[in-house]
């Protein structure tokens, strides 16, 4: 979810998730906490692990709400480009409700901690009526 730039595609994914949950069943979506990412944004990041160097360059498209990322793994020169929709928490709630979910809530961790600006994740919890 979120790796498609078009809202219609992402809402279609949520509707399919809704259809797969039994009535009364619960649904969880683990997503980026976009406010935290924007707050600590670094466009260029290099990580070294197990003899590999992973370079990530990220460009923000604030007008469209997208993060364009280029990943490079060396040695090997593997390059991959990805685009992630930078949904704000309130947008996730709106999309889940449009898909038919109710009792939508947001938490900041799998332990159920409150969603805050510094939370690393934004986890949406919802129910199919």
Language-model segments: which ranges?
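A short hydrophobic/small-residue beta-strand
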Residues: 27-28, 103
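C-terminal lobe and adjacent flexible extensions of AdoMet/dcAdoMet transferase-like proteins
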Residues: 87-129
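A short SAM/SAH-binding and catalytic strip from SAM-dependent methyltransferases
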Residues: 1-9
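A short glycine-rich, Lys/Arg-flanked "PGG" loop and its adjoining helix->strand segment in the class I
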Residues: 11-26
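Glycine-centered flexibility sites
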Residues: 2, 24-25, 108
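SAM-dependent methyltransferase
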Residues: 7, 28-95
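Conserved short-loop catalytic and cofactor-binding motifs
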Residues: 1, 80-83, 111
């Amino acid at each position: 979810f979120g790796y498609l730039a078009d809202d219609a595609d992402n809402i279609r994914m949520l509707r399919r998730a809704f259809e797969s949950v039994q009535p009364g069943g619960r649904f969880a979506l683990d997503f980026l906490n976009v406010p935290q990412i924007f707050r600590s944004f670094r466009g260029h990041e290099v990580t070294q692990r197990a003899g590999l160097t992973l370079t990530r360059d990220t460009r923000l498209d604030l007008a469209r709400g997208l993060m364009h990322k280029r990943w490079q793994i060396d040695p090997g020169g593997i390059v991959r480009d990805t685009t992630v929709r930078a949904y704000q928490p309130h947008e996730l709630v709106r999309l889940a409700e449009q898909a038919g979910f109710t009792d939508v809530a947001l938490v900041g961790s799998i332990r159920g901690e409150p969603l805050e600006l510094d939370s690393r994740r934004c986890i949406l919890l919802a129910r199919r009526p």
